[in-house]
Amino acid sequence: MGLTQKYDNMRLGYLFAILAAVMFGSVSTLAKPLVSLVNPLLLSSMIYLISAATLTPLAHKQRFQSSKRNYLLILAISICGAVIAPSLYFVGLTHASASDAALITNGEVFFSILLAMMFFKERLGIAGYVAMTLVLAGMIIVTTDLNFSDFTLQQIHYQDMLLIISMLFWGIDNNLSRILAQKIHVAKIAQIKSAIGGAILFGIAVFGFGVPLDVELSEIPPILVLGIIGFAASLYFFLQSLKRINTVRTVLIFSMSSIFGLVAASIFLQEQISWYQILAAGIMIFGVYLMNRKESLINPV
């Protein structure tokens, strides 16, 4: 691969990561009104089945290389990223605000980078550590309101814990997807993952918990948007980015989804954004900018 081609490929990777962040950032705002009307498990299953159908035209010509390793990987990816993570996320969202949920998505950055450094021997240069520290500092600001004297573990409600744990499983999904993306087309991974996860969730919701299929006609359009834009398109672009740039870079850029989520919650749900949230957003944006400007200092081993 020539230098120019490699540079263009990396630029595409950054562009795809930004698109994924914008699209996924809209999820909490779109989903918040729905989780009070549609059972979270049923909603998750519908979204992922829609996502699978959306990705089918892009993936139907792509082959899935048959091997025990690939089957185990896609199963693990599906269970972590399309069953456990969305279930916990939407259940937690039923009692959390859309803006809080958007901010907690930065937890995916922590877990994805931590797992990448622990198991895939990725390393950060000086600028990388500074950038990651800025992103982490932004999350600390929005979760504590800079009120450390009164902050206790008791203030972390169960819905917030569910959201945080969901980020752990999406972090596992991110790193496993990166492995499989080296051999399988990203559209095929996203399609199979969504189909398996959606089918499992549908079975659990309808046959396991007896959730009735009573979705109103007016609820279908936002569910379609969630499945097509919030998950199918964002997942596809995210995996495309993983294939072109490493997990650390992709996830740090993807952390901007929380900022887009904050803005969307403020505009469409009239949720108030405080000064410390604005401060945190600025810090995280600068961290991501620094990561891009000092890209050569990121040294995956």
Model-derived segments and spans:
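Glycine-/small-residue-enriched transmembrane alpha-helix faces in small-molecule transporters
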Residues: 1-42, 47, 152-179, 301
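Membrane-interface helix-cap regions at the ends of transmembrane helices
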Residues: 2-4, 22, 26-33, 37, ...
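Helix-helix packing/entry segments at the starts of transmembrane helices
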Residues: 19-21, 44-46, 86, 100-107, ...
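Specific transmembrane alpha-helical segments of multi-pass solute transporters/efflux pumps
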Residues: 23-28, 56-105, 141, 227-245
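Transmembrane alpha-helices of multi-pass small-molecule transport proteins
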Residues: 36-84, 111, 169-173, 190-209, ...
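Specific alpha-helical transmembrane segments that line the substrate/conduction pathway
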Residues: 42-53, 90-123, 127-128, 166, ...
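Hydrophobic transmembrane alpha-helices of multi-pass small-molecule transport proteins
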Residues: 55, 75, 115, 127-146, ...
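Cytoplasmic-side transmembrane-helix entry/capping segments in multi-pass membrane proteins
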Residues: 69-77, 124-136, 184-193, 246
